[in-house]
C-alpha cells in the first residue's frame, strides 16, 4: 500500500511541476478576467431571434456598466447604467439563470403592450418593414410562419418577431411602472421569450454586462455547420 501511495504522490508532484504555470495563470488571470472584464456566452435558445440565433457565441463587455470584484456582484466602480435598447446579459431574478435580453423599460418608465405593440410612457413605438437579410439565418419554419418588423426604441432600431401559432397570453399587458433601481427586459422573439412579463422587474445589480458582437456561430440543426456570415458581426 505504501508503494502505491508513493507512486501516486510522485505522479501528482510531477503533474504539478508540469502544469503549475498553466494552473496559476488560469486561477489568477483567466478566471478573474472572465468574471470582471470580458466574457463570452453561448446562446442555446431562440428568445432573441431574429437578432441572435441559436448557436451564436456572443461577446459580453462586462465593463459596460461597472467594474466588479471577481466572482461576485459587488461593484468596485460604477460608471453607467443599462440604457433602453441595450442587449444585456443578466441573472434571472427567478432562478439566477444567465439570460440575454433587451432592455425595454428604465426606472420610472410606464410600459404597456397591446397585441405585441409596445407603448412606453404613453407613446406607441414605431414599427416598419424588416429586410429579409435579417431573418435568413432562422429556421425555414419560423421564416414562413412568423411576423417580422423593425422596432424603433428611442432611435435604436432592431428586429422583432412574433409567431401567431404559439399559444401565449403575454401579447398584451396593462400599464406597469418600473420601480426605482429596476428594469423591464424582453426578448426580441416576443412570443417565445421568458422575460419580465413572467419574472417581473430586474434589479440593477443582476446585470452582468452588454452583449455587443457575435464572435462565431454554428447551426446546431445542420451538423454544427459554421454560419460564416455571422462571424464577428455587431449586435443592434
Identify the function of each model-found stretch.
Residues 20-36:
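Hydrophobic membrane-insertion alpha-helices, especially the h-region
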Residues 2-15, 36, 41-42, 50-236:
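Soluble "head" domains of membrane/secretory-pathway proteins
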Amino acid at each position: 500500500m505504501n508503494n502505491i501511495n508513493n507512486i501516486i504522490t510522485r505522479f501528482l508532484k510531477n503533474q504539478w511541476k508540469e502544469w503549475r504555470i498553466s494552473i496559476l495563470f488560469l486561477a489568477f488571470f483567466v478566471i478573474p478576467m472572465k468574471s470582471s472584464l470580458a466574457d463570452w456566452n453561448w446562446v442555446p435558445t431562440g428568445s432573441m431571434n431574429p437578432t441572435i440565433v441559436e448557436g451564436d457565441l456572443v461577446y459580453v463587455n462586462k465593463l459596460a456598466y461597472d467594474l466588479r470584484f471577481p466572482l461576485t456582484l459587488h461593484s468596485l466602480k460604477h460608471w453607467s447604467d443599462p440604457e433602453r435598447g441595450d442587449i444585456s446579459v443578466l441573472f434571472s431574478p427567478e432562478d439566477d439563470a444567465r439570460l440575454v435580453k433587451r432592455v425595454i423599460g428604465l426606472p420610472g418608465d410606464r410600459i404597456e403592450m397591446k397585441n405585441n405593440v409596445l407603448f412606453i410612457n404613453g407613446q406607441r413605438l414605431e414599427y416598419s418593414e424588416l429586410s429579409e437579410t435579417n431573418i435568413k439565418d432562422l429556421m425555414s419554419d419560423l421564416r414562413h410562419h412568423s411576423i417580422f418588423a423593425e422596432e424603433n426604441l428611442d432611435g435604436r432600431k432592431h428586429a422583432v418577431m412574433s409567431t401567431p401559432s404559439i399559444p401565449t397570453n403575454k401579447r398584451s399587458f396593462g400599464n406597469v411602472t418600473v420601480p426605482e433601481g429596476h428594469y423591464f427586459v424582453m426578448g426580441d422573439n416576443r412570443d417565445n421569450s421568458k422575460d419580465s412579463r413572467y419574472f417581473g422587474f430586474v434589479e440593477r445589480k443582476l446585470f452582468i454586462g452588454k452583449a455587443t458582437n457575435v464572435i462565431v456561430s454554428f447551426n446546431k440543426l445542420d451538423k454544427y455547420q459554421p454560419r460564416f456570415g455571422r462571424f464577428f458581426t455587431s449586435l443592434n
